[in-house]
From Swiss-Prot:
Induction: Up-regulated by heat shock in a heat shock HSF1-dependent manner. Up-regulated by ionizing radiation. Residues 59-166, 227-313 are annotated as: Disordered. One of its GO terms (biological process) is positive regulation of transcription by RNA polymerase II. Pfam families: IER (PF05760). Residues 253-262 have a biased composition (Acidic residues). Residues 71-84 have a biased composition (Low complexity). Its main location: nucleus. This is Immediate early response gene 5 protein. The lineage of its organism: Eukaryota, Metazoa, Chordata, Craniata, Vertebrata. GO terms for cellular component: cytoplasm; nucleolus; nucleoplasm; nucleus. Disulfide bonds: none annotated.
Amino acid sequence: MEFKLEAHRIVSISLGKIYNSRVQRGGIKLHKNLLVSLVLRSARQVYLSDPCPGLYLAGPAGTPAPPPQQQPGEPAAGPPAGWGEPPPPAARASWPETEPQPERSSVSDAPRVGDEVPVATVTGVGDVFQGGEADATEAAWSRVEGPRQAAAREAEGTAGGWGVFPEVSRAARRPCGCPLGGEDPPGTPAATPRAACCCAPQPAEDEPPAPPAVCPRKRCAAGVGGGPAGCPAPGSTPLKKPRRNLEQPPSGGEDDDAEEMETGNVANLISIFGSSFSGLLRKSPGGGREEEEGEESGPEAAEPGQICCDKPVLRDMNPWSTAIVAF
């Protein structure tokens, strides 16, 4: 009875601490981590205090099954066949070999009978190959040099005809056909006003505005700088992009609401861990409230292993219970 009262007192104190810890930064998360570690400590104490831990392993939910025992007649379980072996070599058909090895040896032995004939044959093949390369090179150069030579001939013919037909050559130099020096074409009356040439440069006010200079992406933030699209003006000093923290006010109320919502999850966490270890704790001789004490105990909890120091039960424990004890 005294043990249960002490467990109730520890639970109430711990729940009060958890409820009051929401005013601290990260307090509720810290207590959740402590709950997880203390639940495992309580499981260790239960396993050490239970005289026959192997009989109650089927009780908790989510307990991994121990590895199956091997029969003496069965071979040892090992990695699957082919594990760790290098891949098989590629087939010979994938390699670009046109002749098998015996034919190569016969070809290499053939020049011994008549040395001059194979050499001449190989030389002729090489000459034909080199001649084909030369023809291909000349054809490529003719394609490139042909338009250049034609353009040069046209330029020379035009330069030679300037002295004979100066007006025609000048008119040919402009795509619109307007004379260069401002002279009127022949046959035009003197009273006719001279029309402006479409090729002449337009005045400055008719020119469209120059496109804005491309600025780096870092400087193109909206509202920064005096140029278009956020770019700095030509004569202005580049400004730094304002931090987003200044634009968005700190939301302290949302954090408080989140922490208040998290306080409701403490009971769910306790119930989850309690259901997972309920099969062990109900059949343990220590009492029914050992689980709650282990979950909610703070600094007042006793050190693990003090309950069952005089019970040698480690010899018949399976790997799952051994792992919990090692924790």
